[in-house]
């Protein structure tokens, strides 16, 4: 006689229910209504989105979820992954899988990187410190958002992280002011500067504007600087490759340029001294190009020709997404919204759970494709759909 299932925890019950044919017969609205109440219940990182929306006030959720204009680029970032299919393998011993990558002489356990964020929301208002603790536990590289550093100095973040973090810079036309920040970060022991160049004044963030109508609270009641009002933003349309050269000449840190989508821009960045490129459209928040970064990535990789490492972000939700980006030539990938969902709903435990799920899925897909190391993931590992 078969042993009855053990329902000693809610998680085990949910797993049993998910395997039942009755579950697949439920109407879509019934499946969408369930919201996880703790990180351990999550089956994938997408389940943290609804939990975050439930936890956040309308304006905060609007800031976290908005794109620009009609959110076409925001949607394209996810839809783009469907343009590529995996070439799975069989009868390959994948008992031992090495997911590690090396970036500027430092070895990391996975190619998954925590992207910077201007504003973070969490139950205990710990923000980037909670993210740093989760990054330390999961041994993940963290990029500290420059706006976050104003409330949590980089040395505090490094202490919570247990090691160096990279720093995201929003340079302004007041170069002396920019250099004060650069020198402070360099003296703190930051090895890499990530210069973000894709945010110009006048963006049309319609989603957040709509949801702000439903929220009468003052921004100062929950965070010191209202989103998108950081000093110097209005001056960023005056920056050029001369700014990049001045940055490179003024610091010993490696300088990556984040926000590149066009191969011509990528080539010019390398010619003007960039140590790396991050292909990014700011999560669909920069401009309404309507194009996914996963589709821009191969063009950038081709023109860079291995002169510098190329990273990519936007739309990553699955281990398969990570695999596809590496096959297209990315050295590593950055995730943003998923860990921010985890943070908003459950604090550092939510961030840690998101990272653990992404790591587990990536490990699994490497095994399914017969890969023992990241170096074995090549363009031949995927096919254009």
Residue ranges of model-derived segments:
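N-terminal secretory signal peptides and thylakoid transit peptides that target proteins
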Residues: 2-21
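Alpha/beta enzyme core
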Residues: 180-312, 328-330
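A gly/proline- and charged-residue-enriched helix-loop-helix capping module
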Residues: 137-158, 164-175
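C-terminal helical cap(s) of enzyme catalytic domains, especially alpha/beta-barrels
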Residues: 299, 344-362
């Amino acid at each position: 006689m078969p042993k009855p299932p053990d329902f000693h925890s809610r998680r085990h019950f949910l797993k049993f229910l998910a395997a039942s044919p009755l579950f697949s017969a439920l109407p879509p609205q019934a499946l969408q209504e369930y919201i996880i109440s703790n990180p351990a219940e999550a089956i994938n990182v997408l389940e943290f989105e609804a939990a975050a929306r439930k936890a956040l006030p309308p304006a905060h959720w609007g800031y976290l979820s908005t794109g620009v204009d009609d959110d076409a680029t925001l949607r394209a970032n996810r839809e783009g992954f469907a343009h590529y299919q995996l070439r799975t393998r069989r009868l390959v011993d994948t008992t031992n899988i090495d997911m590690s990558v090396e970036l500027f002489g430092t070895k990391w356990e996975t190619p998954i990187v925590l992207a910077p964020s201007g504003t973070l929301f969490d139950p205990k208002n710990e923000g980037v410190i909670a993210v740093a603790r989760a990054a330390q536990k999961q041994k993940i590289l963290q990029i500290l958002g420059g706006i976050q550093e104003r409330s949590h100095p980089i040395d505090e973040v490094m202490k919570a992280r247990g090691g160096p973090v990279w720093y995201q810079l929003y340079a302004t036309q007041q170069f002396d002011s920019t250099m004060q920040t650069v020198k402070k970060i360099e003296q703190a022991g930051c090895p890499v500067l990530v210069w973000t160049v894709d945010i110009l004044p006048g963006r049309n963030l319609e989603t957040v504007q709509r949801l702000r109508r439903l929220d009468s609270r003052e921004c100062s009641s929950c965070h010191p600087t209202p989103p998108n009002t950081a000093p110097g933003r209005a001056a960023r349309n005056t920056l050029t490759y001369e700014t990049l050269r001045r940055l490179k000449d003024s610091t010993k840190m490696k300088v990556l340029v984040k926000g590149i989508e066009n191969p011509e821009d990528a080539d010019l960045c390398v010619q003007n001294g960039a140590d790396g490129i991050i292909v990014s459209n700011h999560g669909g928040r920069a401009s309404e190009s309507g194009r996914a970064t996963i589709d821009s990535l191969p063009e950038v990789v081709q023109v860079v020709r291995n002169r510098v490492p190329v990273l990519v972000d936007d739309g990553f939700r699955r281990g398969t997404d990570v695999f596809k980006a590496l096959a297209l030539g990315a050295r590593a990938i950055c995730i943003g919204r998923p860990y921010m969902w985890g943070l908003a709903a459950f604090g550092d435990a939510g961030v840690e759970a998101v990272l653990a799920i992404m790591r587990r899925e990536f490990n699994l897909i490497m095994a399914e494709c017969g890969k023992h190391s990241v170096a074995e993931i090549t363009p031949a590992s995927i096919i254009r759909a």
